[in-house]
Curated annotation (Swiss-Prot):
<feature type="transmembrane region" description="Helical">
    <location>
        <begin position="227"/>
        <end position="247"/>
    </location>
</feature>
<dbReference type="InterPro" id="IPR001750">
    <property type="entry name" value="ND/Mrp_TM"/>
</dbReference>
<feature type="transmembrane region" description="Helical">
    <location>
        <begin position="24"/>
        <end position="44"/>
    </location>
</feature>
<feature type="transmembrane region" description="Helical">
    <location>
        <begin position="354"/>
        <end position="374"/>
    </location>
</feature>
<feature type="transmembrane region" description="Helical">
    <location>
        <begin position="484"/>
        <end position="504"/>
    </location>
</feature>
<keyword id="KW-0520">NAD</keyword>
<feature type="transmembrane region" description="Helical">
    <location>
        <begin position="323"/>
        <end position="343"/>
    </location>
</feature>
<dbReference type="Pfam" id="PF00361">
    <property type="entry name" value="Proton_antipo_M"/>
</dbReference>
<protein>
    <recommendedName>
        <fullName>NAD(P)H-quinone oxidoreductase subunit 2 A, chloroplastic</fullName>
        <ecNumber>7.1.1.-</ecNumber>
    </recommendedName>
</protein>
<feature type="transmembrane region" description="Helical">
    <location>
        <begin position="295"/>
        <end position="315"/>
    </location>
</feature>
<keyword id="KW-0874">Quinone</keyword>
<keyword id="KW-0521">NADP</keyword>
<dbReference type="Pfam" id="PF19530">
    <property type="entry name" value="Ndh2_N"/>
</dbReference>
<dbReference type="GO" id="GO:0048038">
    <property type="term" value="F:quinone binding"/>
</dbReference>
<keyword id="KW-0812">Transmembrane</keyword>
<dbReference type="GO" id="GO:0019684">
    <property type="term" value="P:photosynthesis, light reaction"/>
</dbReference>
<comment type="subunit">
    <text>NDH is composed of at least 16 different subunits, 5 of which are encoded in the nucleus.</text>
</comment>
Length: 510
């Protein structure tokens, strides 16, 4: 009898939960239409992979790419709509969130053609790779629109789990296994730290989880200047720091970059930073509104450490991927300047603009590394010597991307950094901007060192890898080269394009 009553209660509770979920999807589903397109693409990929043979591999690429492009289109059609909060306060839709979602989708769209030939040559499982990329993209998009503490925790976990699997995708590679282990352990530790910070925030606000309601709760409980908020700030900064990978939370970055498959590194190097930056702007700006001086100081310390350590250690690297890992640590220091400046003085607009340029610069560089690695089997910087004599197309594609990362005029990276530093200077961050300028000069040194190697014609400096290099034609239908050309063109955009990009970024501010 008791079992029968319990069974009936369970059925009733399950029915209520199902009906509530159906009601939310029915009335709020339109607010996550771009995400729904990706979910539909994931379902199609699973169905095709489980019911077809190897002959349908092109369909897998087509479906994944089409899903991403359609999701971007849905985002663009939704541009300039009124901000809306949906799913009982869990999700917020506005232009500011959507611009970050657009950047994540753009990264994923460019990474898929960049991965095609690599996957074929290394005989990696294609369907699973595409599933992990799309699922990570989905997690990043939900993180950009997250409006409560639970979603802010669950969404990056979705992204992180796929990242762990992607980084260890080449199971027979010892370096890949080592990188995955470090990534997984540090990721788990950082998630625990982040949740601990959320618990302090939850308790101090009187049990609120929505970001704006947390602010109201802190005012009602008079806890906005309490030690508990300071503890929450420290723990949350450390947790988010793992995703952004500034110093000293960068220990996992070089090993993961070196050990993971190169297309995976290209994907993780940009999407994780875009998603984490979107989350950081909302968490620091809203719940910690009353602690702005404290989190400004914390982020300034992280930015200074990142710019100095990242660029100085990059000079000593012999692996191209490790060099780019330390370079990315320095780059995130520049992005943090925009987060500190915030809404005032165009900080967020300059940060968004620089991240757009960083996507093109970084993915263009990684596309060149993928091609070089497939043709030579090496990642050593020294082995790039004399590449111009064998493959001028690849050498001349890599050079502008590296120069743009260094911030040399008239390339896109120069104007992106210029606007970012100018906004920081106007906000009074004189010391931070000065460090940024000095470290940018340091970064130019090690980028120019690589370009000098590329262009050398002296036989004694050319390694056997380049001597035996299989020369490619100037024009190719190769999907990696197509992705590379798009990124190189975007990296060399002159300053005349800055004003409309800045205007669009300014239009997204909440």
């Amino acid at each position: 009898m008791i079992w029968h009553v319990q069974n009936e209660n369970f059925i009733l509770d399950s029915t209520r939960i199902f009906m509530k979920a159906f009601h939310l999807l029915l009335f709020d589903g339109s607010f996550i239409f771009p995400e729904c397109i990706l979910i539909f693409g994931l379902i199609l990929l699973l169905m095709i992979d489980s019911t077809s043979d190897q002959k349908d591999i092109p369909w897998l690429y087509f479906i994944s790419s089409t899903s991403l492009v359609m999701s971007i289109t849905a985002l663009l059609f939704r541009w300039r709509e009124e901000p809306m909060i949906s799913f009982s306060g869990n999700f917020q839709t506005n232009n500011f969130n959507e611009i970050f979602q657009f950047l994540i989708l753009l990264c994923s769209t460019l990474c898929i053609p960049l991965s095609v030939e690599y996957i074929e040559c290394t005989e990696m499982a294609i369907a699973e790779f595409l599933l992990f990329v799309l699922t990570a993209t989905l997690g990043g998009m939900f993180l950009c629109g997250a409006n409560d503490l639970i979603t802010i925790f669950v969404a990056p976990e979705c992204f992180s789990l796929c990242s762990y699997l992607l980084s260890g995708y080449t199971k027979k590679d010892v370096r890949s296994n080592e990188a995955t282990t470090k990534y997984l352990l540090m990721g788990g530790a950082s998630s625990s730290i982040l949740v601990h910070g959320f618990s302090w925030l939850y308790g101090s606000s009187g049990g609120e989880i929505e970001l704006q309601e947390i602010v109201n709760g802190l005012i009602n409980t008079q806890m906005y200047n309490s030690p508990g908020i300071s503890i929450a700030l420290i723990f949350i900064t450390v947790g988010i720091g793992f995703k952004l990978s500034p110093a000293p939370s960068h220990q996992w970055t070089p090993d993961v970059y070196e050990g993971s498959p190169t297309p995976v590194v290209a994907f993780l190097s940009v999407t994780s930073k875009v998603a984490a930056s979107a989350s950081a702007t909302r968490i620091f700006d809203i719940p910690f509104y009353f602690s702005s001086n404290e989190w400004h100081l914390l982020l300034e310390i992280l930015a200074i450490l990142s710019m100095i350590l990242g660029n100085l250690i990059a000079i000593t690297q012999t692996s191209m991927k490790r060099m780019l890992a330390y370079s990315s640590i320095g780059q995130i220091g520049y992005v943090i300047i925009g987060i500190i400046v915030g809404n005032s003085n165009g900080g967020y607009a300059s940060m968004i603009t620089y991240m757009l340029f960083y996507i093109s610069m970084n993915l263009g560089t990684f596309a060149c590394i993928v091609l070089f690695g497939l043709r030579t089997g090496t990642d050593n910087i020294r082995d790039y010597a004399g590449l111009y004599t064998k493959d001028p197309f690849l050498a001349l594609s890599l050079a502008p991307c590296l120069l743009s990362l260094g911030g040399l005029p008239p390339l896109a990276g120069f104007f992106g950094k210029l606007h970012l530093f100018w906004c920081g200077w106007q906000a009074g961050l004189y010391f931070l901007v000065s460090i940024g300028l000095l470290t940018s000069v340091v970064s130019i040194y090690y980028y120019l060192k690589i370009i000098k190697l590329l262009m050398t014609g002296r036989n004694q400096e050319i390694t056997p890898h380049v001597r035996n290099y299989r020369r490619s034609p100037l024009r190719s239908n190769n999907s990696i080269e197509l992705s590379m050309i798009v990124c190189v063109i975007a990296s060399t955009i002159p300053g005349i394009s800055m004003n409309p990009i800045i205007a669009i970024a300014q239009d997204t501010l909440f």
